[in-house]
A protein has these predicted regions:
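Beta1-alpha1 glycine-rich phosphate/pyrophosphate-binding loop at the start
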Residues: 16-20, 50-61, 69-70, 75, ...
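Extended interfacial segments that mediate partner engagement and assembly in macromolecular machines
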Residues: 116-158
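Ferredoxin-type iron-sulfur electron-transfer modules and their immediate structural context
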Residues: 1-133, 186, 223
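Core beta-strand elements of the Rossmann-like FAD/NAD(P) dinucleotide-binding domain
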Residues: 219-225
Length: 225
């Protein structure tokens, strides 16, 4: 019945490209398409501490650095430290990378923390008043590394007055003795620890639990936990 004729398809070389061929507002419109009204943002889900990343970035964009720091410190006692050494799992999941590059989430967090460290009156989280039985109990925490200091921080926010025992002469554990200064400056660690002291946390350095003092002796001194 005659030769088969296929419809001719335009090739790239046949197409006159110009501004009429693309959407100048692609970035913003693409972001709206990938935005959901509910659920957890991928960046927050990827963060080991589940910090409210969208919240503090929005506050920082409005210049509300104290509010942004307050939001961060609900979950993270050491934003300046994390700003220096964080693995940035949040940025790896940032949906902005589908358009161009992920947001500089970690740098924003570090910037917020730096604004506070430069301030004459630094932000000290509000402590819940001791209004329940047992809040005056003495609590001993062994070691002043990230885990020990975090434990002391959240206990202090609940109204307790924990005591941190550190065998070394300096506080901070691996943050101070294990991470080189070019990655994490010691002044940054010390600045974070100063806020813990403002919360009423007591520190005893040069005391090795199990050698200089035993658990039984701590019990005798009135420590309940």
């Amino acid at each position: 019945d005659g030769p088969v004729v296929y419809p001719k398809k335009p090739l790239p070389d046949d197409t006159p490209w110009g501004e009429h061929m693309w959407n100048k507002n692609y970035r913003n419109e693409n972001g709206v398409i990938q935005t959901y009204d509910s659920g957890t943002a991928p960046c927050k889900a990827a963060c080991p501490l589940h910090i409210a990343i969208q919240g503090y970035i929005n506050m920082a964009s409005e210049g509300r650095y104290k509010d942004a720091l307050k939001l961060i410190k609900k979950d993270n006692p050491f934003p300046a430290v994390c700003g220096a050494i964080c693995h940035k799992y949040c940025e790896k999941e940032c949906t902005r990378s589908s358009v161009d590059d992920p947001l500089a989430i970690d740098d924003i967090k570090m910037f917020i923390a730096q604004q506070d460290m430069k301030d004459e009156f630094r932000y000290v989280p509000e402590v819940i008043p001791c209004n329940r039985v047992g809040y005056d109990q003495k609590i001993a925490i062994i070691g002043s590394g990230p885990a020990g200091l975090s434990c002391a921080y959240f206990l202090a926010l609940e109204g307790y007055k924990p005591t941190v025992f550190e065998k070394d002469k300096v506080l901070g554990g691996m943050m101070t003795t294990g991470i080189p200064n070019f990655r994490l400056e010691k002044d940054v660690v010390n600045a974070e620890i100063e806020i813990l002291k403002e919360l009423g946390i007591e520190f005893k350095t040069g005391v090795e639990v199990g050698k200089d003092v035993t658990i039984a002796e701590l019990r005798e001194q009135g420590y309940k936990g």
